Design a protein with these regions (language model features):
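Bacterial N-terminal signal peptides
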Residues: 9-20
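Sec/Tat signal peptide C-region and signal peptidase I cleavage site
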Residues: 20-26
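ATP/NTP phosphate-donor binding region
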Residues: 27-102, 280, 297, 320
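Accessory alpha-helical/coil subdomains and C-terminal extensions
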Residues: 28-30, 35-39, 57, 63-68, ...
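Short Gly/Thr/Asp-enriched flexible loops that form oxyanion-binding sites at enzyme active sites
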Residues: 113-135, 271-280
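Short, acidic/small-residue loops that bind anionic groups at enzyme active sites
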Residues: 124-155, 162-165, 283-293
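Internal gly/pro-rich beta-alpha loop/helix module
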Residues: 140-210
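ATP/nucleoside-binding phosphotransfer catalytic cores, i.e., glycine-rich phosphate-binding loops
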Residues: 273-352
C-alpha cells in the first residue's frame, strides 16, 4: 500500500478511537438504559470478612455480559450501590423520578433496573404505580453474588435487555424477570430465600418467559393503575396478627404518628377480639386500617360476622386489600392515602 494511504488509514483509525467510534453496526442498534441500585447482583465476596459486600458498578455489571454489545447500546445510570434491605420509601420517589427521566429520552428503548431480591417485589410495584411511560421497564436481581461461579446475574441482565427489545414489549408495566420468567410487578412475590427460581405470581401466573430464541408473552396484566407521586410519602405502619396478640402494636402505631396501618391478618382477613378493638380504636382516630391476608394465595374479603371477622371489620371502617400481599398493600397505601382517607374512596384503589 502507498505509504501516504497507509498513514491516512492509520490516522483515521486513531481519530475514530479518540472520538468514541464504534463498529458500524452499533449505530443501528437500539439503546437500553441500565439503572443500577446495587445488592447481590453487584456484590462480591470480601476477602477479609468472607461475606458478600457491594463491589460492582453498573458499568462493571454490563461489562460482565459481552453479548450485550451484540444486541444493544447500553447506557448505565448508577443510582445507588446498597443492599435492597436498605431500599424503601425514603429512596423510592427518587428512583421513580430517575427512571422517568431516563425513559423521557427518545433514544432509550427501555430501562433495566438492577436491584436486590429482598425488596424487589415492592420497589417494582412502586415504580409500576408511579411511572407513566409505556416503554418497558424490567427489574432484575440475582440470588447468587458475582463471586460465585454460577452467578445468575449476567443471564438475568441479558434476558432483561432481550425482553425490552422484543416485539410487543411495550405497555406491560414494570415487570420482574429472573430465571427466564416474566412477572407483573403487582403480582410478583419472592418465595425462596436462595433458589434462583424464587419469583412467581401465585394464582395470576407468569406473563411469559425469555427463551433461547425468543421472548414469549402469554398474557397481560389488566389490573394496573397510575397514581401521582406526592411531595411527601406518609408513614404507613404494618402490624401482624398472631394468636394471642393484645392489639397493643396497632394502638401504639395509632398513637405515635402512623397515617395508616396495614394489618397482616389471618385467612380471609380475620383477627382476634383484642385486635378488633385496637383496629376500631385506630379507625375512630381517623387512621385508615387496611386488612391484608398473610396467606400466599387468595384474597382478603369481609366474610365472617363474628367479632374480629372480616365482615365486622369492614363495618367498623376497615379497607380490604384483596389479593395484594401485606407488603404491597402498604406500597399502595403510600400513594393512595395522600389522596384520600375515606373508606369507600380508599377501597376503590384496592379494588382496581
Amino acid at each position: 500500500m502507498n505509504p501516504l494511504r497507509l498513514q491516512a488509514a492509520f490516522l483515521g483509525l486513531v481519530l475514530a478511537g479518540s472520538l468514541g467510534g464504534s463498529p458500524s453496526h452499533a449505530a443501528d442498534l437500539p439503546t437500553v438504559a441500565v439503572v443500577a441500585t446495587g445488592c447481590t447482583i453487584a456484590m462480591k465476596q470480601d476477602p477479609v470478612t468472607h461475606a458478600p459486600v457491594p463491589a460492582l458498578s453498573g458499568e462493571d455489571l454490563t461489562a460482565s455480559v459481552p453479548k450485550l454489545k451484540e444486541i444493544a447500546n447500553v447506557k448505565v445510570v448508577d443510582f445507588s450501590n446498597i443492599p435492597s434491605y436498605y431500599m424503601g420509601p425514603d429512596r423510592w420517589p427518587a428512583l421513580a423520578r430517575k427512571v422517568e427521566e431516563v425513559l423521557a429520552d427518545p433514544a432509550i428503548a427501555g430501562v433495566v433496573v438492577t436491584h436486590g431480591t429482598d425488596t424487589l417485589d415492592q420497589t417494582s410495584y412502586f415504580l409500576d404505580l408511579t411511572l407513566r411511560s409505556d416503554k418497558p421497564v424490567v427489574a432484575i436481581g440475582a440470588q447468587r453474588n458475582a463471586s460465585e461461579w454460577d452467578t445468575d446475574g449476567p443471564r438475568n441482565l441479558l434476558n432483561a435487555v432481550r425482553q425490552i427489545l422484543a416485539e410487543d414489549a411495550k405497555g406491560k408495566g414494570v415487570t420482574v424477570t429472573l430465571n427466564h420468567r416474566i412477572n407483573a410487578a403487582r403480582e410478583v412475590r419472592k418465595t425462596h430465600t436462595s433458589n434462583v427460581e424464587t419469583f412467581n405470581s401465585g394464582d395470576a401466573g407468569f406473563l411469559g418467559y425469555v427463551d433461547e430464541d425468543r421472548v414469549v408473552f402469554s398474557r397481560q396484566s389488566l389490573r394496573r393503575q397510575t397514581l401521582p407521586l406526592p411531595d411527601r410519602l406518609p408513614r404507613i405502619d404494618m402490624v401482624a396478627m398472631y394468636p394471642g396478640t393484645d392489639g397493643s402494636q396497632v394502638r401504639q402505631a395509632a398513637d405515635s404518628g402512623a397515617e395508616a396501618i396495614v394489618v397482616e391478618a389471618l385467612g380471609w382477613g380475620n383477627v382476634n377480639e383484642a385486635m378488633h378493638d385496637a383496629i376500631k380504636y385506630a379507625i375512630d382516630k381517623g387512621i385508615p386500617v387496611i386488612i391484608a391476608t398473610k396467606v400466599y394465595n387468595g384474597r382478603a374479603l369481609p366474610i365472617y360476622g363474628s367479632k374480629g371477622g372480616g365482615n365486622m371489620l369492614q363495618k367498623a371502617g376497615a379497607v380490604f386489600a384483596g389479593d395484594l400481599t401485606p407488603d404491597k398493600a402498604r406500597v399502595l397505601a403510600l400513594l393512595a392515602v395522600p389522596i384520600t382517607k375515606e373508606q369507600k374512596a380508599l377501597q376503590a384503589y384496592y379494588d382496581k
